[in-house]
Each structure stands twice: as structure tokens, then as C-alpha cells.
């Protein structure tokens, strides 16, 4: 498998001849987007699975979340966009900018889409909000003869290629660059990867793509405050959509002639490094290639990714309790050893204020698993859920201790192993201890042999919320039609007369 030999560590002369003035990190992303060729069939098959999973998540969200439905649709009710993006699961027709926001929300909001860890964490499928909206608009507009397109063909093969490359850009940045240390939210990498992908899709030159990427680093970046403690709010569910929307807007601005700033990262007075990230700049463990799409974690339950191992461990321990004729009242303590990332992101004590707070609390999802005997569902986090005010939930949360474990953290950060481990030990009221259950590769992890079947089942369950079996089969078949136009593919997801509620 070919690996891109141009990255931020090693630059070829050819890369810099055209625009040596652009920061090397900016040039590397643009070069990869425009010049790297993917020939491996397995890589494309992984992309098909990720695309199906993401579209299933979108249908689940539009079906289950009234809160999300209130955010969908044109900003100005009744506005019309000729040949606009057809938002899956609805009858909305949107501009590619607004469509990127809405599609980004649908994929991300219920925290059921894929994930990838590292020094930074994130969700590479977030980028599909930008990719799908732009490709659909280009495909329809060029077919109607109202837009002259000079970029790659708007086919399923191109969609998969853009997906693979967006995943790779975001994933390689996540491995060693901890934006969270600086209070920056990980959706900055969605903006980066989506800007690169959309620039290529729109037919921008490599030079113009560098200009667009420079605008990503000139932007003020969103902070993690909306994911933090009592300040956690639903914005964490639409932050990726916001990043997609901005990426599309930037690419269009550059398409219409706006220049970039070559030193957006390294300008000694005002660059991103000196003002935000530190003099050492970005670090990279590997060159851009096809690594991320092959290692992404496909969630089989709507739980923040770092907590899924703990949920699975809880279900096993619950079964052991029942085998011994014991119940939850017999538990005196629950000890969880897990990764430093899990401890930082989802270890929450005290009052939980809303659904966004609950779905990012490891103690809450563990308690849910013990009480229900099954993984959490999106409705379990809602304010009107009986679990939201359950004293039994609170009692189990109070008994749960979370400890970051050095070995599990090393394995999580190891680029070759990439486990997502958690170990759970149960202490009983009679003074005895139940043996630890250790889950290193939970369902959804590419190293778990059950993942493929579980993800396919997840897709079909989600799709049945709005589609019949015949329609689902047609969608799955279409995914293998490399020459199919993207707008023809997305037409399969339209639900007439189901727009939801327009945002005001």
C-alpha cells in the first residue's frame, strides 16, 4: 500500500516549487489531497462501511431527536435553493453551506457515529457533513447545466476517495497533537480536513487549497467549554456541523478569488503557533496515507467512545452478579481503571444538568448498563427519561471510582495497538471482591471480530426507522456502484413531506 511521502516531516522539492512560501504543514495537506492515489480495494471497502454507518446515524438522529429537528432547514423559512443538497431523511433542499451544518448535526448529535483516539480525540465521519452537501450540490447543478465543474467527477468513487482522505487528515493530526490542552475543541480538525476535501471537490488548484487551509488557522477556534462540567450544553452536538459549514464557506470564498496567508501558522507576531499552540508546532507519527479509515472505531452503542469498554464490562459483571444470586444492592463499590483520555473527558461527579451532560458521564452510562441489563439508548439521556432523576442511578454513580491507568493509556496511544481498554472490579457488601473484567477491544473496534456484523445490524435498525427493507437493500447495492452520480445516491434517502421544523 502506497503511503504519501510528503508530510510535515519530509517535504519533496516538487511539493515546494509551486508555493514554497506556504507553511510546510499547510502545503503537506494540500499535496496529499491533490496528489495521493488510493489503489487498495480494502481501503475503499472500509470507506463504504463508514459511509453507511454515518448515514444510518443521520437517519437515527432525524427520527429520534425533536431537539435536532428544530435546528434543521433553511435559516430563512421558505427560501428555495435550485439544485440544492437533499438532506437525508427529510424533504429539505438546502444550500451547500447550510446543508453542511444540518448534515453535520445529523451524523454527530446522538454520539453514535465513529470515533478515533490519540493525543486528541474526534469523529472523522463528521467531515461527511461538508463532503456530502457540496458533492450533491455540484452533482445536481452540473447535471442541470447551471454550473461548470472542473474538479473530479461527482461519483460514488470520488465520494469514497474524499472520505478516506478527510479521515486521514483528521486522524494523523489527532495522533500526537493535543488541542484540548489549549482548551481548543477537536472540531478544529473537522474544519481542516473538510476544507481540504471540499477545496479539491470544487476543483480548486493545489495553490488555492493551500490558501483555503490557511484560513482555517486564521480563524479563532472553538473552545471546549461546551463539553466541560456544568457548562456542558447541546452545542457539543452541533459543533461539528458548525465546522463543516465554515469549511464549505471558506472553500467558496477562495474559489471566488480570496487569497490565503502563507504564514498562518508560523508568522512570528500573530501566527497560530506563537499565539495558540506553542513554538514546537504540530507533531506527526506517520505520513498521510490510508491509516485512519482502517483504524476508525465504529460505535455499536450511543455512548462516548471512551466509555464503551466500561459499559461492556458492566454488562458482564451484572451477569456474574445474577449467577451468584446477587443484585445491585449487594455492590459496595465499583472500581474502573481506564485511559487518561476517558478520565479527562467523561469522569463526572455531582449533578448532571442535561442530556449533553449525561451522555458524557462514564458513571451514568455504567449505572444504566447495570440497571437495564443492556447498553444505553439515546432516549435514556433525555431530561424526561426516568433515569435522569433515578436515585438508583445516583447511588451507583456515587459508588463508582474512575482511575486513569498508565498501561491502558500507553496502549491507547500506541499507533500499532490502539486499544480502548477499561477494567472493572466489583466490591461487595459482604467484603468479597469480584474478579476484574478487562475489555481492551470493545465492539466497534476494528480488532474486534464482531464489529462488522454489529455495525451492519446497527445500520439496518437505524434505516428501518424511515425506510422499508427494499429501500435499504437498494441503498446498500448503490454503495457499490462506483460510477453512480452522488445526487442519484442521495435521492434514495429523501423522505417527502417530512421536513421537520424549520429553525428560526
From Swiss-Prot:
GO cellular component, as recorded: mitochondrion
Keyword RNA-binding attributed: no
UniProt-listed SUPFAM superfamilies: 2-methylcitrate dehydratase PrpD (SSF103378)
Biotechnology: Phomoidrides A and B (also known as CP-225,917 and CP-263,114) are potent inhibitors of Ras farnesyltransferase and squalene synthase. CP-225,917 and CP-263,114 inhibit Ras farnesyl transferase from rat brain with IC(50) values of 6 uM and 20 uoM, respectively. CP-225,917 inhibits squalene synthase with an IC(50) value of 43 uM and CP-263,114 with an IC(50) of 160 uM.
Catalysed reactions, semicolon-separated: (4E,11E)-2-hydroxytrideca-4,11-dien-1,2,3-tricarboxylate + 2 H(+) = [4-(deca-1,8-diyl)-2,5-dioxo-2,5-dihydro-3-furanyl]acetate + 2 H2O
EC number: 4.2.1.-
Pfam families hit by this protein: MmgE_PrpD_C, MmgE_PrpD_N
GO molecular function: lyase activity
Expression induction: expression is induced under low pH conditions.
UniProt KW keywords: Lyase
Involved pathway(s): Secondary metabolite biosynthesis
Family: Belongs to the PrpD family.
Subunit structure, as described in the record: Monomer.
Its job: Alkylcitrate dehydratase; part of the gene cluster that mediates the biosynthesis of the antihypercholesterolemic agents phomoidrides which are dimeric anhydrides. Within the pathway, the alkylcitrate synthase (ACS) phiJ and the alkylcitrate dehydratase (ACDH) phiI produce the decarboxylated monomeric anhydrides by coupling the C12-fatty acyl product from phiA with oxalacetic acid. The pathway begins with the highly reducing polyketide synthase phiA that catalyzes the formation of a C12-fatty acyl-ACP, starting from one acetate and 5 malonate units.
Name of the molecule in the record: Alkylcitrate dehydratase phiI
Organism the protein comes from: Fungal sp. (strain ATCC 74256)
